[in-house]
Amino acid sequence: MSNPFAHLVEPLDPAQPGKKFFNLNKLEDSRYGSLPFSIRVLLEAAIRNCDQFLVKKNDVENILNWKVMQHKNIEVPFKPARVILQDFTGVPAVVDFAAMRDAVKKLGGNPEKINPICPADLVIDHSIQVDFNRRADSLKKNQDLEFERNKERFEFLKWGSQAFHNMRIIPPGSGIIHQVNLEYLARVVFDQDGYYYPDSLVGTDSHTTMIDGLGVLGWGVGGIEAEAVMLGQPISMVLPQVIGYRLVGNPHPLVTSTDIVLTITKHLRQVGVVGKFVEFFGPGVAQLSIADRATIANMCPEYGATAAFFPVDEVSIKYLVQTGRDKEKVKHIKQYLQAVGMFRDFSDSSQDPDFAQVVELDLKTVVPCCSGPKRPQDKVAVSDMKKDFESCLGAKQGFKGFQVAPDHHNDHKTFIYNNSKFTLAHGSVVIAAITSCTNTSNPSVMLGAGLLAKKAVDAGLSVKPYIKTSLSPGSGVVTYYLRESGVMPYLSQLGFDVVGYGCMTCIGNSGPLPEAVVEAIVQGDLVAVGVLSGNRNFEGRVHPNTRANYLASPPLVIAYAIAGTIRIDFEKEPLGVNAKGQQVFLKDIWPTRDEIQAVERQYVIPGMFKEVYQKIETVNESWNALAAPSDKLYCWNPKSTYIKSPPFFEDLTLDLQPPKSIVDAYVLLNLGDSVTTDHISPAGNIARNSPAARYLTNRGLTPREFNSYGSRRGNDAIMARGTFANIRLLNKFLNKQAPQTIHLPSGEILDVFDAAERYQQAGLPLIVLAGKEYGSGSSRDWAAKGPFLLGIRAVLAESYERIHRSNLVGMGVIPLEYLPGENADTLGLTGRERYTISIPETLKPRMKVQIKLDTGKTFQAVMRFDTDVELTYFHNGGILNYMIRKMTK
């Protein structure tokens, strides 16, 4: 079918008639000029891809009529220009593709039809752990261990890059996916097949939104959805409301981009932006560098929006030149965006589009702050940190409470480390990590940390040796400018050696703490602290022994490491006392903004980016030496504990079955609010007494070889055993934190996997009860695949985080939502009832279904299949089954 909008096509430059674009101004529709810039990107993609099948003319009209339709809950298709994956989510995607090829072959189709149509980049950044720190060879040793642990996964990924077209792999050691995307992969404008069009993407990592800081529309999706996009399917999304976030004023000289983003995170959580786009505008935006904008856009999942968009302006264009992009390409990028009405001047208010709602922040009101101790939205001013931590100590167990009895607030424990005596107390810092895509891509905060380290060393300060310090930059570029500017030796002297290029501590790959430290924490029952420049600090994520974790800017991470405790008021108390007996305060060593900018201007230069990135795909010799099979179908190794053919498609036929009601289901878990995907499917270490550990031990592995759950995502047997295996899981059946539940027929307390297995052996269906924001956090597809394998047919919750709900749909698990004002408490549900959920043969989006209990009580819930496309996936038993049937016909 030809495109009904073909008449909009014209050359961008008459001198190059072969280079065309869809000129949206030729629509001659006054509504276009008042659309938010983010919605203009959706509109262009719909017009360019309009085939009257996947994308219909009516979809284009709905997007153009955004001002009215944003309130109508209507779905629109979106075909992004590309996909990015990281290795933890990328391995299961390639496993699924390999298994889908097998399934298509088995059903009589051509397996090579399973191939990415949409270009995909897979960046390996999640595997490296902080095993070695505080030594010059930490990086080399951690990278060697990474290869030793992950050889089989890496070989499999290398096979995938050869077996599938359109899939590029960025080897380990290159940097963090979002920074590599910002500095290297992002096109801003595509120039492909004779057409210019806006760069846009979805990624299998929730912090994909970082790229919105450069004016590239992108957000995180579940791995399952990303696979469908790679196979040419559009994403089906509800046309979002767009909140205009107006920035005015100039930030105070002592304030960092981290302080601004933590302030915005708290503010937008209060405004309520889940499922919406946020678009930044106003004169304050022009004051922010691309690194600052990217930091703000990065934490979009923490404030709950789908995307946090900064349209392209002159600052974006300068950044492209600064990062070594081709000057001719940059010229065409600006020319195209101006021609199509997508280039922004933030000082010109006549360009301000319509928004659903406008909120404002005056940057001069931002103060230095941290967030914690358990959630990124719980912002605390640095001046209040001591007082806030001490009130959390005694407060009842919760997001801001540890329930330590008042007479134990000053407990402490002495221990011996490296033949010296030290003391730990509540609030002692045991992990200090400069880590994560949020901050390590920002030269101003990284150089700020380096200059602070230099001044601290010059003033005679040091960091206690038992504190686990680490620096994991987002790319080789960071190391380059830290080294060239001369601050690296000072960072090393304080223990902040480069330990690897990857997510590391931010995703729980913090590695072990010294045994003496763990012993002191456990014996003293102490609330020990991790301070990190990360973006998430949910319980049990950073390290099992740090009950309090605070997000802070890189300079503050160093400051708290030097202080050794969170219980310090920097204004009144010294950071430390030097050998001369002089007290040194934080204000004495805090670098000024002018100092930082002078160093940044001198050392962050285009040549550096070119040098790092021109050899990115070949620089890792260990990767180059890996052997990988060349077959188009993967030859599964039955002995492998990393890569296993999943059971998802074993019984798949070409015929569709009508939907079945769920009869007499038991509740596997009865959960509360804010259950994260970390609770459902942890990414960190495999506990020695867990079902997954027993599985690995039975196959002859020692605990040293267990690796992490994240690295085992290519093996469904381990991931099923790791489902709900987080030690911080709070199940109302037990009233304590444990990865366990009650097997209701027998009354026994079992590990969640063992209980689920028992129910499945008896042929009994399962559901999960939950509260608000079920599935918040990382875009973890195993948080939907795992429950599916445990036999969970439905989840009944008060509300869902966007990505997780669509992942459940993608696996054929029914997301049910209580009616407004109702929940387990108001309905008097204990979770010990048996549930029958009536599912009619004819389904409609967001329809209500009847739930009947064995007590005789009945109530209704909303079936959260939000679009017709989602219902199609459900009828097929999930999105991948749908794709296999489609590719086989």
Curated annotation (Swiss-Prot):
Main location: cytoplasm
GO molecular function terms noted in the UniProt entry: 3 iron, 4 sulfur cluster binding; 4 iron, 4 sulfur cluster binding; aconitate hydratase activity; ferrous iron binding; iron-responsive element binding
Gene Ontology CC: one annotated term: cytosol
Organism: Bos taurus
Family per record: Belongs to the aconitase/IPM isomerase family.
Oligomeric and partner information: Interacts (when associated with the 4Fe-4S) with FBXL5. Interacts with frataxin(81-210).
PANTHER family: ACONITASE/IRON-RESPONSIVE ELEMENT FAMILY MEMBER (PTHR11670)
Origin superkingdom: Eukaryota
Subcellular location: Cytoplasm, Cytosol
Keywords tagged on the record: 4Fe-4S, Cytoplasm, Iron, Iron-sulfur, Lyase, Metal-binding, RNA-binding, Tricarboxylic acid cycle
Residues the entry annotates as binding substrate: 86, 205-207, 536, 541, 699, 779-780
Cofactor: [4Fe-4S] cluster
Record EC number: 4.2.1.3
Residues that coordinate or bind [4Fe-4S] cluster: 437, 503, 506
Protein name: Cytoplasmic aconitate hydratase
Note accompanying the cofactor annotation: Binds 1 [4Fe-4S] cluster per subunit.
Catalytic activity: citrate = D-threo-isocitrate
GO biological process, one term: citrate metabolic process
Entries under CDD domains matching the protein: AcnA_IRP, AcnA_IRP_Swivel
Enzyme class at the top of the EC tree: lyase
Signal peptide: none
Function summary: Bifunctional iron sensor that switches between 2 activities depending on iron availability. Iron deprivation, promotes its mRNA binding activity through which it regulates the expression of genes involved in iron uptake, sequestration and utilization. Binds to iron-responsive elements (IRES) in the untranslated region of target mRNAs preventing for instance the translation of ferritin and aminolevulinic acid synthase and stabilizing the transferrin receptor mRNA.
InterPro entries reported for this sequence: AcnA_IRP_Swivel (IPR044137), Acnase/IPM_dHydase_lsu_aba_1/3 (IPR015931), Acoase/IPM_deHydtase_lsu_aba (IPR001030), Aconitase/3IPM_dehydase_swvl (IPR015928), Aconitase/IRP2 (IPR006249), Aconitase_4Fe-4S_BS (IPR018136), Aconitase_4Fe-4S_dom (IPR036008), AconitaseA/IPMdHydase_ssu_swvl (IPR000573)
